[in-house]
């Protein structure tokens, strides 16, 4: 689900625009915003992607173009182990198409929340990915960077991390 358009910081590039979206089910209403331990939280993923353009070739990008993205992804508490960051990173990279292969860089953060007091016993886990990459120029229909393909790839990755109720039934 498309949520809103984002605009770039003038310190990053001359031009830029991005989109924010979410995937999943908000079946339990406000349980996601209430926080820890909700089933709804395990079925929501959010993220954004921004396409940046600099008039002058950026040496650190090796291009005029750069994509910057963020995702907050669901994670089953039992899946929170030392292998998780690498698995999420590898899965994410499988969704990229039309990019400079050596240009992908970023971080994966896995969180574990433990509640206390009146919320005692509630735990939840999550994963956050911050990543940037250089898209290939000339892949779009008009011979420029295909921004739509970059957005579709990022959205497909985020959606792939959601477990829907029908998945649980099988």
For each predicted feature, which ranges?
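Short, conserved charged micro-motifs
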Residues: 28-31, 77-83, 138-150
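A composition-biased, non-transmembrane "mature-region" signal
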Residues: 7-14
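Short, internal acidic amphipathic alpha-helical interface segments
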Residues: 80-118
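Glycine-rich, often proline-containing surface loops adjacent to acidic residues and nearby aromatics
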Residues: 16, 61-77, 123-134
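Mixed-charge, glycine-accented linear interaction segment located at domain edges/termini
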Residues: 130-170
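Short, small-residue-biased leader/transition segments that mark boundaries at the very start
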Residues: 1-6
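Aromatic/basic-lined ligand-recognition segments
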Residues: 47-55, 111-130
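A glycine-rich, hydrophobic loop/mini-helix early in the fold
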Residues: 20-71
């Amino acid at each position: 689900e498309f949520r809103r358009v984002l605009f770039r910081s003038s310190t990053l590039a001359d031009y830029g625009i991005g989109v924010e979206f979410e995937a999943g089910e908000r079946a339990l209403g406000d349980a996601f915003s209430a926080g820890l331990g909700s089933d709804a939280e395990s079925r929501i993923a959010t993220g954004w992607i921004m396409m940046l353009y600099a008039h002058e070739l950026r040496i650190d990008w090796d291009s005029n173009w750069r994509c910057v993205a963020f995702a907050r992804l669901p994670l089953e508490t039992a899946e929170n182990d030392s292998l998780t960051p690498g698995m999420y990173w590898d899965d994410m990279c499988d969704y990229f198409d039309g990019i400079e292969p050596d240009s992908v860089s970023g971080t994966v953060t896995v969180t574990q929340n433990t509640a206390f007091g009146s919320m005692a016993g509630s735990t939840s886990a999550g994963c956050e990915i911050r990543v940037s990459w250089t898209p290939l120029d000339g892949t779009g229909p008009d011979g420029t960077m295909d921004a739509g393909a970059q957005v579709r790839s990022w959205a497909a990755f985020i959606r792939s991390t959601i477990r829907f109720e029908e998945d649980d039934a099988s």
